[in-house]
Curated annotation (Swiss-Prot):
Modification type FMN phosphoryl threonine: residues: 176
Chief place of localization: membrane
Gene that this polypeptide is encoded by: rnfG
Name of the protein: Ion-translocating oxidoreductase complex subunit G
GO molecular function: electron transfer activity; FMN binding; oxidoreductase activity, acting on NAD(P)H
Protein species of origin: Shewanella oneidensis (strain ATCC 700550 / JCM 31522 / CIP 106686 / LMG 19005 / NCIMB 14063 / MR-1)
Top-level taxon: Bacteria
Ranges annotated as spanning the membrane: 9-29
Top-rank EC class of the record's enzyme: translocase
Keywords, in A-Z order: Cell inner membrane, Cell membrane, Electron transport, Flavoprotein, FMN, Membrane, Phosphoprotein, Translocase, Transmembrane, Transmembrane helix, Transport
Length: 212
């Protein structure tokens, strides 16, 4: 142990170990802060979509994973947050993907009550062109609010299209692809929910398994 080279090697190894541990701690703390912030943002969005006066449960605690590529636009399992009152389901907020946006996937979430009425829609993530396709963001435009109160009468309800295609929804000047993809994605999610309510509400609450 009196060999200087051995001592220096041990000191370097100890220093490296301490640095690695410090980096791991900092990374974990950063991850926890990011996760907490994301959770707060999600809570805010869920409360925008599903009014607090119609449910008495914590939405993020009652979450199930749905998997249906045709309806949700992805092969991945997507979270769905169930609102209940006195233990009975009253509404749901489902995440879905519009896979055919102008610049790729658009991630959105749609709130629907058990009568099939849309309570609200919000955009969670997208890469659409600033100044054109980004009007799907509430902070840029109130376009997404046009879904509120809508009911899908049938799977091929012609009203659920942009006006250019004969429907009720405005298209954007110079950007028809984005709203067309968005309307189709919301329509698919709403139809899926209205046709599979009982099945969805009977699924296990398993969203934590996805995040572990």
């Amino acid at each position: 142990m009196n060999n200087p080279m051995i001592k220096n090697g041990l000191l370097l190894a100890l220093f490296a170990l301490l640095c690695t541990g410090l980096v791991a701690v900092v990374n974990q703390q950063t991850f926890d802060k990011i996760k907490l912030q994301q959770q707060k943002e999600l809570m805010g969005i869920l409360h925008q979509l599903i009014p607090e006066e119609i449910h008495d449960n914590e939405l993020t605690a009652q979450c199930t994973l749905l998997q249906n590529k045709e309806a949700l636009g992805t092969e991945d399992a997507m979270p769905a947050y169930i609102a209940t009152a006195a233990g009975k389901p009253v509404a749901i907020a489902m995440e879905a993907i519009a896979p055919d946006g102008y610049n790729g996937n658009i991630k959105l979430i749609v709130g629907i009550n058990t009568q099939g009425e849309v309570l609200g829609v919000r955009t969670l993530a997208h890469q659409e062109t600033p100044g054109l396709g980004d009007k799907i963001e509430l902070r840029k435009s109130d376009w997404v609010t046009k879904f509120v109160g809508k009911v899908l009468k049938s799977e091929d309800d012609k009203q659920w299209q942009v006006q250019k295609d004969g429907g009720d929804f405005d298209q954007f000047t110079g950007a028809t692809i984005t709203p067309r993809a968005y309307v189709k994605a919301v329509k698919r999610a709403v139809w899926y929910f209205t046709q599979h309510q009982a099945e969805i509400f009977s699924q296990p609450l398993n969203c934590e398994a996805k995040h572990d």
